[in-house]
Amino acid sequence: MAICDCYANNEDDAIEILNDGFLKIFKEIHRYKPAYANEINSFKGWLRKIMVYTAIDHFRKNKKHHLVGELDVAVTQPSAHEISGLDKVSYDEIIRFIQRLSPAYRTVLSLFIIEGFSHEEIAEQLGISVGTSKSNLAKARKQLQKILHNQNQISEIKNVG
């Protein structure tokens, strides 16, 4: 379910992605062929791949509702001081922060950082330009930094009081 949460707008969308993914898995289970000696890891990878591509399909289906304009912006890596509070944040909080991003930003961020897709692969899968992928990733990182900064300020206020 965590994969679905990363790509969904809300819990209902995550459940829809999960259900669609399991339908695909049940329909295609006969095609599964273990790629490695360790069948469990191979099967988990196969399931994960189906869920990710189901989430991409969900994004494409709803793309017209949340397209972001194309901009060619260079992607910059966040500096250490910009993400310094990350170690104070739980996994569930990170997922909630990611869910607060727009669908376009959230999808590109998840595909790039979590799934390891290249910008070229993201552009091909989502039907956007490489520049848009880079721009959306940069904007997603910037928004997450703001969210994290605000969260840290709230935590500091609570600790003082």
Model-derived segments and their meaning:
Residues 108-112:
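A short pre-motif secondary-structure segment
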Residues 1-20, 153-154, 161:
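Short, charged helix-capping/linker segments at alpha-helix termini
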Residues 4, 14-25, 122, 133, ...:
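Short, small-hydrophobic-rich alpha-helical interface motif
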Residues 64-91:
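Internal acidic/polar
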Residues 27, 31-33, 48-69, 139:
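Arg/Lys-rich amphipathic alpha helix in sigma70-family domain 2
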Residues 66-67, 124-127, 141-161:
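C-terminal edge and immediately downstream basic/flexible tail or linker adjoining helix-turn-helix-like DNA-binding
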Residues 6, 22-40:
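Sigma70-family region 2
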Residues 16-23, 41-53:
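Structural recognition of an alpha-helix C-terminal capping motif at a helix-to-coil junction
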